[in-house]
């Protein structure tokens, strides 16, 4: 079993999610030991939701799942890089392909790119 340093950071490790083909950074989430093990077991990106305090397999609600193609770990064993196939087109809950869809321009943020889906329709909120 691969042992990562979950203790150093209070039980949660940052997990960077990147498109396996293009290299585009899709999102940053957090993994605890349980979500790490579930990701390894299932091949589907599973994170720890800090707001809901529960495991969160990406895309179960929206259909925008992340199939893990490769996993890398940093030199200190406390940061995870998931290279994924983003199925469904969008990684962000706002409907955008990437969570990094805000561009800093001087003293303001500008949204770049169009949403792939309408979150109101998908999440019924």
From Swiss-Prot:
A single GO molecular-function term is: magnesium ion binding
Q: Name one GO biological process term.
A: L-histidine biosynthetic process
Location(s) in or outside the cell: Cytoplasm
Q: Which InterPro entries match?
A: PRA-CH, PRib_AMP_CycHydrolase_dom, PRib_AMP_CycHydrolase_sf
Q: Does the keyword Transport apply?
A: no
Q: Which pathway does it operate in?
A: Amino-acid biosynthesis; L-histidine biosynthesis; L-histidine from 5-phospho-alpha-D-ribose 1-diphosphate: step 3/9
Co-factor(s): Mg(2+); Zn(2+)
Q: Which reactions fall under this protein's catalytic activity? A: 1-(5-phospho-beta-D-ribosyl)-5'-AMP + H2O = 1-(5-phospho-beta-D-ribosyl)-5-[(5-phospho-beta-D-ribosylamino)methylideneamino]imidazole-4-carboxamide
Keyword vocabulary terms for this entry: Amino-acid biosynthesis, Cytoplasm, Histidine biosynthesis, Hydrolase, Magnesium, Metal-binding, Zinc
The cellular component terms of Gene Ontology attached to this UniProt record, alphabetical and capped at eight, are:
cytoplasm
- The EC number on file is 3.5.4.19
Signal peptide: which range, if any? Answer: none
- What are the binding positions for Mg(2+) in this chain? 74, 76, 78
Q: State the similarity comment.
A: Belongs to the PRA-CH family.
Record text on subunit structure and interactions:
Homodimer.
User: What is the role of the protein in this entry?
Assistant: Catalyzes the hydrolysis of the adenine ring of phosphoribosyl-AMP.
Return the HAMAP family for the record: HisI (MF_01021)
Protein name (record):
Phosphoribosyl-AMP cyclohydrolase
Name the species this protein comes from.
Desulfatibacillum aliphaticivorans
In the UniProt record, the gene name given for this protein reads hisI
């Amino acid at each position: 079993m691969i042992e990562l340093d979950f203790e150093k950071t209070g039980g949660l490790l940052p997990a960077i999610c990147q498109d396996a083909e293009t290299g585009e950074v899709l999102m940053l989430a957090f993994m605890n030991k349980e979500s790490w093990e579930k990701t390894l077991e299932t091949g589907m990106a599973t994170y720890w939701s800090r707001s809901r305090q529960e495991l969160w397999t990406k895309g179960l609600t929206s259909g925008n799942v992340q199939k893990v193609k490769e996993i890398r770990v940093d030199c200190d064993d406390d940061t995870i890089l998931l290279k994924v196939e983003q199925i469904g087109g969008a990684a962000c809950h706002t409907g955008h392909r990437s969570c990094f869809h805000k561009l800093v321009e001087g003293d303001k943020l500008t949204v770049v790119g169009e949403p792939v889906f309408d979150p109101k329709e998908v999440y019924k909120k």
